[in-house]
């Protein structure tokens, strides 16, 4: 059964979801880089 043109599914706009995903990814990468650079292993006075 071939779909008619009027029955074609509209795509949802991806922009909002993509932005939220990028924000989450940025936050995770920031936390990972903080641990990687050893900020948490330094004495308490050097912590940001």
Swiss-Prot record:
InterPro entries, alphabetized: Spermatozal_protamine_typ
Record key words, sorted: Chromosome, Developmental protein, Differentiation, DNA condensation, DNA-binding, Nucleosome core, Nucleus, Spermatogenesis
Gene Ontology biological process terms from the UniProt entry: mitotic chromosome condensation; nucleosome assembly; sperm DNA condensation; spermatogenesis
GO molecular function (one): DNA binding
GO cellular component annotations of the record: nuclear chromosome; nucleosome; nucleus
Annotated region (Disordered), positions in chain: 1-48
Main location, first listed in the record: nucleus
Keyword DNA-binding set for record: yes
Ranges of Basic residues composition bias in the record: 1-29
Tissue specificity of this protein: Testis.
UniProt-annotated location(s): Nucleus; Chromosome
Additional observations: Two isoforms exist, a major form and a minor form. This is the minor form.
Function text: Protamines substitute for histones in the chromatin of sperm during the haploid phase of spermatogenesis. They compact sperm DNA into a highly condensed, stable and inactive complex.
Record protein name field: Sperm protamine R3 isoform 2
């Amino acid at each position: 059964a071939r779909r008619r043109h009027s029955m074609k599914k509209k795509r949802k706009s991806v922009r909002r979801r993509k932005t939220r995903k990028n924000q989450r990814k940025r936050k995770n990468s920031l936390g990972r880089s903080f641990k990687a650079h050893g900020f948490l292993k330094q004495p308490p006075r050097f912590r940001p």
